[in-house]
């Protein structure tokens, strides 16, 4: 009886999990090990050492393990000899590992083993003399111990290895901290010999000026030595050294502060005198020195000498740059600004003729062309505004248009500038401006419409209130876009905005209908982005609250192009418009502003569209599109649906499986999607077939 009951009782998975959970609640604590006598201590030490040795043998290059081993010996056993032995063994493995050297040294220092640490630092710098970090650690340690003679000795040994400037700077800072001025000067003498550049000399000068400014002879001697050395050792690598100009500026400023303005003036003249060929100073350095000289003249020169020297110097500089490169428009601009400010009319006019006479040869609309055209525009405005010569200005505008290769590219700012010029300076300026803008459209619409010109012309006619001309311009813009297969959505959008602004809603409807018809014409379809055109159309009809019209457009679109994106757009549209109740409430209310909220009726409409899309792609056996639809539906439910509706949609997501098929004579792997909707319909057939086979088997037996 008991056997029968045991056989009938089956252990469930829940019971197994309950037992496992109860067992997991049991608390297991590691037994605490206590050491009672010396033998147990030795046994424990032997065990730990064996563990460390095993870890080290596994990876001898892991120097961190060696360090942990040594620290354990010190912290737990106070066995420094054994710890040092371990660290020495680690050095045998990799003696060039700088962080390990530092850890070894700091370990000794932390336990106040100064002599051991000093011996280690000696070994370290002898082993790795090119590593600055070890030298820095050595000198910092000795300075901390106030062993200053030893610090100097270490620095001197370090300098024998010809280190970089950081070592020299550290040595100088050390001596400067303890105000050992003579020692600092001695080091600087070696420093400038080792690094004979302007930066090194400037450090010395800066030190003397900060600490010994009243010692005039010494400071001047350093300045003179610096300049003499740098000029005599001029080479390509320091030829344009900006620090040299800084030294000169500092020298002259210091001389002035000492009441030696005449000496400072002589220094500038000596360096800037072009007749003197003894000093080879680069143009860049000389320019920097000249800038300092100008500042000097402002403070100590007379007005005439200052202005004359500045203008002449800058003019010569710009003329040389222009002569070297006639297309250096930056120099041209500075040069002509200088001439304009100096009221030199004839020279400025000649400069305008020269710069506009050098036509750019680039075949594309390059930055050179853009800068070149700006000089033409400046030239025309200068003649009109400054010289009051509209005849000459008109000729300049025409000549500018002649040099532009309009078949390749053009400049809207020139056409617009010319038309505005005629508006300002002619009795029949409006007619001339329209003629210029019409000519611009004709000459610049060979490859594609020049949008800036169309926009400017349309805005002009809007200001004049000539709606018929505005419509003609929009139609011309659209015509050019279609003939040149350019994007036409912008002109449609702007055209609709214009008609809507003057409340011509029937015209807007006609424009959008015509645009849709043109987009369906194979001859013009390449000029339209259907998605953007749809957005413009939907946006307009939404503003007009013609939601049924939008639905008709979507249905027509789905008949022609029933892709997943269009279905999703249609579905989401239903949730972006107000419900009938919300619309009725708005129409009966007094509020001018209206904000639609998503309620259940809108959500249900969106779901119906998604369901319709799923059915459509299921009938077409387009599983990829079904996947896109169901994922979009899921995203929609996450935002607007309930947990129940989201769960229903989530359960309809397909299972991704990998299958193989033979294409031709080649077997390939592909991804298939198994939808639960499809499997649920197949299940009854499989079950009936299984039952039929079972019945047949039973009859045979």
From Swiss-Prot:
Read off the InterPro entries from this record.
HAT, HAT_Syf1-like_N, HAT_Syf1_CNRKL1_C, Syf1-like, TPR-like_helical_dom_sf
Q: Which regions are annotated as HAT repeats?
A: 43-75, 78-110, 112-144, 146-177, 179-210, 214-253, 266-299, 309-341, 343-378, 388-424, 545-576, 601-642
An example GO biological process term is: cis assembly of pre-catalytic spliceosome
- S-S pairs: none
Please give an example of a GO cellular component term from this record. Answer: post-mRNA release spliceosomal complex
* Keywords from the named record: mRNA processing, mRNA splicing, Nucleus, Repeat, Spliceosome
Q: What GO MF terms are annotated?
A: chromatin binding; DNA replication origin binding
Compartmental location: Nucleus
Q: List, alphabetically, the Gene3D superfamilies matched.
A: Tetratricopeptide repeat domain
The entry describes its oligomerization and partners as: Associated with the spliceosome.
PANTHER family linked = CROOKED NECK-LIKE PROTEIN 1, PRE-MRNA SPLICING FACTOR
- Give the function comment from the record: Involved in pre-mRNA splicing and cell cycle progression. Required for the spliceosome assembly and initiation of the DNA replication.
Family indicated by similarity: Belongs to the crooked-neck family.
Please state what the protein is called: Pre-mRNA-splicing factor CLF1
Task: Name the gene for this chain.
Answer: CLF1
């Amino acid at each position: 009886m008991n056997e029968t009951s045991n056989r009938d009782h089956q252990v469930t998975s829940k019971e197994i999990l309950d037992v496992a959970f109860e067992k997991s609640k049991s608390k297991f604590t590691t037994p605490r090990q206590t050491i009672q006598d010396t033998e147990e201590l030795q046994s424990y030490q032997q065990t730990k050492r064996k563990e460390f040795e095993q870890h080290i043998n596994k990876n001898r290059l892991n120097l961190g393990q060696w360090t942990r081993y040594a620290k354990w010996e010190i912290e737990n056993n106070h066995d420094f000899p054994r710890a040092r032995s371990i660290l020495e063994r680690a050095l045998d493995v990799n003696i060039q590992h700088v962080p390990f050297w530092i850890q070894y040294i700091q370990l000794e220092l932390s336990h106040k083993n100064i002599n051991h640490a000093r011996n280690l630092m000696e070994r370290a710098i002898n082993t790795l003399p090119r590593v600055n970090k070890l030298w820095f650690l050595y000198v910092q340690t000795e300075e901390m111990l106030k062993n200053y003679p030893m610090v100097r000795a270490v620095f001197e040994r370090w300098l024998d290895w010809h280190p970089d400037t950081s070592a020299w700077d550290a040595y100088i800072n050390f001596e400067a901290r303890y105000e050992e001025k003579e020692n600092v000067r001695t080091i600087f003498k070696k420093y400038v010999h080792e690094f004979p550049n302007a930066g090194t000399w400037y450090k010395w000068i800066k030190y003397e000026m900060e600490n010994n400014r009243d010692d005039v002879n010494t400071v001047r001697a350093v300045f003179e030595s610096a300049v003499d050395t740098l000029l005599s050792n001029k080479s390509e690598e320091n030829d344009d050294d900006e620090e040299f100009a800084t030294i000169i500026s500092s020298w002259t400023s210091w001389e002035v502060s000492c009441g030696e303005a005449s000496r400072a003036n002589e220094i500038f003249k000596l360096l800037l005198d072009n007749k003197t060929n003894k000093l080879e100073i680069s143009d860049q350095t000389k320019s920097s020195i000249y800038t300092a000289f100008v500042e000097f003249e402002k403070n100590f020169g007379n007005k005439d000498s200052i202005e004359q020297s500045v203008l002449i110097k800058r003019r010569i500089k710009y003329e040389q740059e222009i002569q070297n490169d006639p297309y250096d428009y930056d120099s041209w601009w500075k040069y002509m600004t200088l001439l304009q400010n100096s009221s030199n009319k004839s020279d400025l006019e000649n400069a305008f003729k020269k710069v506009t006479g050098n036509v750019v040869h680039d075949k594309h609309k390059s930055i050179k062309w853009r800068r070149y055209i700006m000089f033409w525009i400046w030239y025309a405005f200068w003649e009109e505004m400054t010289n009051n010569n509209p005849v000459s200005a008109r000729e300049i505008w025409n000549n500018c248009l002649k040099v532009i290769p309009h078949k390749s590219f053009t400049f809207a700012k020139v056409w617009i500038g010319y038309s505005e010029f005629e508006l300002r300076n002619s009795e029949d300026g409006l007619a001339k401006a329209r003629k210029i803008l019409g000519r611009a459209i004709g000459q610049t619409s060979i490859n594609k419409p020049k949008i800036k010109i169309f926009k400017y012309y349309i805005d002009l006619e809007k200001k004049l209130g000539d709606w018929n001309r505005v419509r003609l311009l929009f139609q011309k813009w659209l015509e050019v876009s279609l003939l040149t297969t350019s994007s036409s959505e912008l002109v449609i959008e702007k055209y609709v905005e214009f008609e809507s602004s003057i409340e011509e809603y029937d015209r807007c409807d006609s424009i959008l209908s015509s645009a849709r018809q043109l987009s369906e014409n194979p001859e013009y379809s390449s000029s339209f982005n259907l998605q953007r055109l749809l957005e413009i159309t939907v946006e307009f009809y939404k503003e007009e609250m013609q939601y049924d019209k939008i639905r008709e457009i979507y249905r027509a679109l789905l008949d022609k192009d029933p892709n997943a994106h269009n279905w999703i757009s249609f579905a989401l549209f239903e949730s972006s418009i107000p419900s009938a109740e919300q619309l009725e409430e708005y129409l009966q209310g007094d509020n001018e502003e209206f904000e639609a909220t998503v309620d259940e009726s809108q959500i249900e409409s969106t779901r119906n569209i998604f369901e319709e899309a799923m059915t459509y792609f299921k009938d077409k056996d387009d599983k990829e599109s079904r996947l896109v639809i169901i994922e979009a539906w899921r995203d929609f439910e996450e935002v607007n649906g309930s947990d129940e509706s989201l769960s229903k949609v989530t359960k309809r997501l397909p299972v991704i499986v990998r299958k193989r098929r033979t294409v031709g004579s080649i077997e390939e792997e592909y991804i298939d999607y198994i939808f639960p909707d499809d499997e649920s319909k197949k299940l009854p057939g499989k079950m009936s077939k299984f039952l039929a086979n079972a019945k047949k088997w039973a009859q045979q037996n």
